[in-house]
């Protein structure tokens, strides 16, 4: 990444699947923080209602691996077998060139990798579910998950929860309005808005 880019910052939201990070990120995007969503590239199937180039850049496994070999990612992870997710360098540069700060909605390891790559320019926030039971309920309510994917995600969640201590801030999402307020407070302080 070139050093002459706008001195934008990065706000990273990570959590186990179903903890509410996407809902919080969408809320923050509606506020006056000059944030722009970093669209990740992924190899997973597109879900109903999702839009290529808005929710994700949906690419083939072959294309993803080629981009890895060409060092086109800031970070990438094989989140589940043959389901790769990553942040393209061009995506961060695009947002900074527009004069905005980047906001990420990424898995736990991806969030930690971004924090490591960008250091003090990045704020890493972990969204904590109230319990594993509530996490399972949220995944089941999505109606986009198979029993197998719920089992896989729930198997990964305890390990992800242990990594919460590695983040700059933790938001407990037991009440959505409180989580929104805490997210606004944390992000505002980091960006110098409050």
Locate the predicted segments by residue.
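Post-Walker A helix-loop "phosphate-sensing" segment adjacent to the P-loop in P-loop NTPases
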Residues: 30-38
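Conserved lysine of the Walker
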Residues: 21
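Pre-Walker A (Motif I) flank of P-loop NTPase domains
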Residues: 6-11
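A glycine- and Lys/Arg-enriched "phosphate-lid" helix/loop adjacent to the NTP-binding pocket
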Residues: 44-49, 72, 96-101, 105-108, ...
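Post-Walker A alpha-helix
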Residues: 24-25
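P-loop (Walker A) phosphate-binding loop of NTP-binding proteins
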Residues: 14-16
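ATP-dependent small-molecule kinase phosphotransfer cores
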Residues: 42-102, 109-112
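NTP-dependent small-molecule kinase module
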Residues: 2-4, 137, 141-145, 159-194
């Amino acid at each position: 990444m070139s050093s002459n880019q706008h001195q934008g910052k990065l706000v990273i939201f990570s959590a186990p699947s179903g903890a509410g990070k996407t809902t919080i990120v969408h809320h923050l995007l509606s506020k006056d923080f000059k944030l722009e969503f970093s669209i990740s590239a992924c190899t997973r199937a597109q879900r109903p209602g999702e839009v290529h180039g808005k929710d994700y850049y949906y690419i083939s496994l072959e294309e993803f691996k080629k981009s890895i070999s060409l060092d086109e990612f800031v970070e990438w992870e094989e989140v589940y077998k043959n389901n790769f997710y990553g942040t393209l360098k061009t995506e961060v540069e695009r947002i900074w060139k527009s004069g905005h700060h980047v906001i990420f909605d990424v898995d736990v390891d991806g969030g930690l990798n971004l924090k490591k790559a960008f250091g003090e320019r990045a704020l890493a926030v972990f969204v904590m579910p109230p319990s594993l039971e509530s996490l399972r309920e949220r995944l089941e309510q999505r109606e986009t998950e198979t029993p197998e994917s719920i089992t896989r995600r729930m198997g990964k969640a305890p390990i992800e929860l242990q990594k919460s201590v590695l983040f700059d801030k933790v938001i407990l999402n037991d009440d959505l309005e409180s989580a929104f307020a805490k997210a606004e407070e944390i992000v505002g302080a980091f960006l110098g808005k409050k």
